[in-house]
Amino acid sequence: MKNKILKIATRKSQLAICQAQYVHNELKHYHPTLSIELMPIVTTGDKFLNIDAKNKIKKGAFIKELEHALINFRADIAVHSMKDITVPLPDELTLPVLCKRNDPRDAFVSLKYPNIDTLPIGSVIGTSSLRRQCQIRAHRPDLVVSNLRGNIDTRLKKLQYGQYDAIVLAVAGLQRLQLHEYIRVHIDPSDLLPAMGQGVIAIECRSNDADILSLLSPLYHQETSFRVRAERAVTTYLESYCHLPIASYAEIEEDQIWLRALIGLPDGSKIIRTEGRAPLDQAEKLGFILAEDLLIKFKR
């Protein structure tokens, strides 16, 4: 990389730029002389973010254009939210680094109410995540769960304009944008199980680029990698069979991976949960085992 500018492909959203800047700062910490440039790109998913349409944004819509930039050598690395990586990577690309995980929980955000249990019957709560909708409806079937699209700023404005009584957002996104004051409650995973990879920044690059792989290696966080490996195995297995709400969340306890997962119906009328523990080197295997268990129980 001597005398070369390392180009970081990123989405154009404020949060994506913030995450790319975090990677920029970490790389500069380990490689002070490295020249780095951010390369913001509008993705297919971004184009439809603010459209209140019934059409679901396709898988991979937030990363496809960034991957094209890597494949075409216009960028050296791409920075993603791990939860956006819902499709297999192209053969020529790899995901060598998962940065240390931020808070993986969801946040309850409201201008009037301290938590979801204090919302009056018929209150409108906003989220477009099927995972959140499913679990919220199961817990509070008397609420109106309404789709909520747009970036974080747009969603907060819709709350402020009174379109919603409350909304649910990822804690990590609010923290990165210095919007902690909006968080009324950090929702415990036992009450709202997080998405695969929530709170994790992932770095993608070309598989055969030894120089880049070497530069990125100090940013690799092993514990996060074990956790996401287990979580991703669940979603990879289940998404090949169905398009239902899925959640998977792993923690490490005493050198073991503790994985919780669920699958349900969007209306919350049916949720199947499971959990298990395994040695760290069997994290992925545990994910596949639990996913199979969920599918069998769900079909009964």
UniProtKB/Swiss-Prot annotation:
Keyword Magnesium: no
Catalysed transformations (reactions): 4 porphobilinogen + H2O = hydroxymethylbilane + 4 NH4(+)
Keywords carried by this UniProt record: Porphyrin biosynthesis, Transferase
UniProt xrefs under InterPro entries: HemC (IPR000860), Porphobilin_deaminase_N (IPR022417), Porphobilinogen_deaminase_C (IPR022418), Porphobilinogen_deaminase_C_sf (IPR036803)
Gene3D superfamilies to which the protein is assigned, alphabetical: Periplasmic binding protein-like II, Porphobilinogen deaminase, C-terminal domain
Coiled-coil residue spans: none
GO cellular component, one term: cytoplasm
SUPFAM superfamilies assigned to the protein according to its UniProt record, in alphabetical order: Periplasmic binding protein-like II, Porphobilinogen deaminase (hydroxymethylbilane synthase), C-terminal domain
Source organism, top-level taxon: Bacteria
Modification type S-(dipyrrolylmethanemethyl)cysteine: residues: C242
One biological process term in Gene Ontology: protoporphyrinogen IX biosynthetic process
Co-factor note (free text): Binds 1 dipyrromethane group covalently.
Similarity field: Belongs to the HMBS family.
Protein name: Porphobilinogen deaminase
Organism: Blochmanniella pennsylvanica (strain BPEN)
